[in-house]
Amino acid sequence: MQKIPSFISRFIQDNHVVNFAAYTIDDFWTASCFYAFDHNMARLILLTSKNTRHSQIMLHNPKIVGTISAQITDIQAIKGIQFSATSQLLTKQDTEYHSSLTHYYQRHPFARLTSSDVWLLHLDMIKYTSNEYLFAQKSIWQRHTE
């Protein structure tokens, strides 16, 4: 696995809401969720019920696309990512379940007040755009080089 560049990781870590779309041949839906970023494994951890429309679609097709963007109004401060990922529903029997949930709770302590299903979004490709130093500067990261 390729390491995500630090400037992209920092951007992902500094934000907390992911927007994504799930699809099958018969249905598609979008969702916005709080996330915790697991830099070492290049994945997002999120809590969402497996009974939601987007989760039901992800159970049939784990491939998703999404965005994370800062909510700013100054065009020179625009930063964001577009990504493709593979979703995975964790069960309590999965070895990563408890560590993923702990990681999420560290980022979002209020989530302890309710129970929900734990999902991993394994980032496969990221396109990062920033206007910070150069207008519309783009950087691409891929989990695996071809």
Curated annotation (Swiss-Prot):
Domain of life: Bacteria
Record-linked Gene3D superfamilies: Electron Transport, Fmn-binding Protein, Chain A
Similarity field: Belongs to the UPF0306 family.
HAMAP family, A to Z: UPF0306 (MF_00764)
Protein name as it appears in the record: UPF0306 protein HD_1359
Natural source organism: Haemophilus ducreyi (strain 35000HP / ATCC 700724)
